[in-house]
C-alpha cells in the first residue's frame, strides 16, 4: 500500500519536471532565434520581444530565404546590403562588448600592447569587410576608414574612463547604415603607445573567407540557386590573434 502511495506522489512531480524541461527548451530555442533572425536581432534593443513576434519574424525570414522568386537587379542588391548591415551591426556590438570586458573585467589599459593588437586585428577585419560588395549601390558614398582619435561622447559615459573613442570619420554615411530602430554602438577605444603588429601577408591571404565575404557569397549563391543546399553555412576561421 505504501509503495502505491509513493508511486502516486512521484507521478505528478516527474510530470512537472518534464513540463519544465520542455518549456526551458522552447524558451532556449526562442532566445536563439531572437539572436539569429536579423529582424528580431535589430529590435532587441527596443525592448523584449514576445514569443509570437519572434516566431512571425522567423517565418518571414525563412520564406524570404526559400523563395524561388527572389528580387533581381537593384532590389537584389538592396537585399544583400541589408543582410550585410545586420552583420556589421553585430560585429560592432561584439567589438564594443569585448572592449568593455577587457577594460573593466580584465583591467587592461589602453596602452597595453596585447590590448592594442586585439583592437588592431578586429578593426582590420572590419575594414576588409566594409568595402562595398554590391555594384548596383555604387552611387552611395565610399566609407572613410581613416581612424582618428577623438574624445568619447556622452553615449559612452557609462563605461570606464580609459575607454577613449575612435571611429571612422563620417561614420554616419556609407553603404552600410545602421539597421532601423537599432541603437548605435558606442565608439571603440584604440590608443596604442607602440607600433602594432598586424597579420602577415600570408595570413591576410589565407584560404578562409572573412565573415563578411562568406556572408555575401552565401547569399549570392542563395539568390542565384534557390535550393536547400544553399543554406549550408560554414564557420569562418581566422589565424590566431595572439
Curated annotation (Swiss-Prot):
Classification via SMART domains: HLH
Any one biological process term the GO annotation gives: transcription by RNA polymerase II
Repressor as UniProt keyword: yes
Keyword Magnesium: no
Pfam families: Hairy_orange, HLH
Residue ranges constituting the bHLH domain according to the UniProt record: 10-65
GO molecular function: DNA-binding transcription factor activity, RNA polymerase II-specific; DNA-binding transcription repressor activity, RNA polymerase II-specific; identical protein binding; protein dimerization activity; RNA polymerase II cis-regulatory region sequence-specific DNA binding
All copies of domain Orange, residue ranges: 87-122
Alphabetical keyword list: Acetylation, DNA-binding, Nucleus, Repressor, Transcription, Transcription regulation
SUPFAM superfamilies reported in the protein's UniProt record: HLH, helix-loop-helix DNA-binding domain, Orange domain-like
N6-acetyllysine modification, residue list: 48
Cellular component per GO, a single term: transcription regulator complex
Annotated localization: Nucleus
Function: Transcriptional repressor which binds preferentially to the canonical E box sequence 5'-CACGCG-3'.
Family membership noted in the UniProt record: Belongs to the HEY family.
Quaternary structure and interacting proteins, as annotated: Self-associates. Interacts with HES5 and HEY2.
Protein name as catalogued: Hairy and enhancer of split-related protein HELT
Organism: Homo sapiens (Human)
Gene designation per UniProt: HELT
Amino acid at each position: 500500500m505504501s509503495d502505491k502511495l509513493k508511486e502516486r506522489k512521484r507521478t505528478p512531480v516527474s510530470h512537472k519536471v518534464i513540463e519544465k524541461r520542455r518549456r526551458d527548451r522552447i524558451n532556449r530555442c526562442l532566445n536563439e532565434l531572437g539572436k539569429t533572425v536579423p529582424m528580431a536581432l535589430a529590435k532587441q534593443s527596443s525592448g523584449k520581444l514576445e514569443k509570437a513576434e519572434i516566431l512571425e519574424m522567423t517565418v518571414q525570414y525563412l520564406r524570404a530565404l526559400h523563395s524561388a522568386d527572389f528580387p533581381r537587379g537593384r532590389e537584389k542588391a538592396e537585399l544583400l546590403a541589408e543582410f550585410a548591415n545586420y552583420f556589421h551591426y553585430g560585429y560592432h556590438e561584439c567589438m564594443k562588448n569585448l572592449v568593455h570586458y577587457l577594460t573593466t573585467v580584465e583591467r587592461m589599459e589602453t596602452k597595453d600592447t596585447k590590448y592594442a593588437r586585439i583592437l588592431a586585428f578586429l578593426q582590420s577585419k572590419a575594414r576588409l569587410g566594409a568595402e562595398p560588395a554590391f555594384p548596383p549601390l555604387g552611387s552611395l558614398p565610399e566609407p572613410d576608414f581613416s581612424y582618428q582619435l577623438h574624445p568619447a561622447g556622452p553615449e559612452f559615459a557609462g563605461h570606464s574612463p580609459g575607454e577613449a573613442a575612435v571611429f571612422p570619420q563620417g561614420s554616419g554615411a556609407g553603404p552600410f547604415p545602421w539597421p532601423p530602430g537599432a541603437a548605435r554602438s558606442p565608439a571603440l577605444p584604440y590608443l596604442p603607445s607602440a607600433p602594432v603588429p598586424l597579420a602577415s601577408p600570408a595570413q591576410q591571404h589565407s584560404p578562409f573567407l572573412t565573415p563578411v565575404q562568406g556572408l555575401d557569397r552565401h547569399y549570392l549563391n542563395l539568390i542565384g540557386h534557390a535550393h536547400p543546399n544553399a543554406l549550408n553555412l560554414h564557420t569562418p576561421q581566422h589565424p590566431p590573434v595572439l
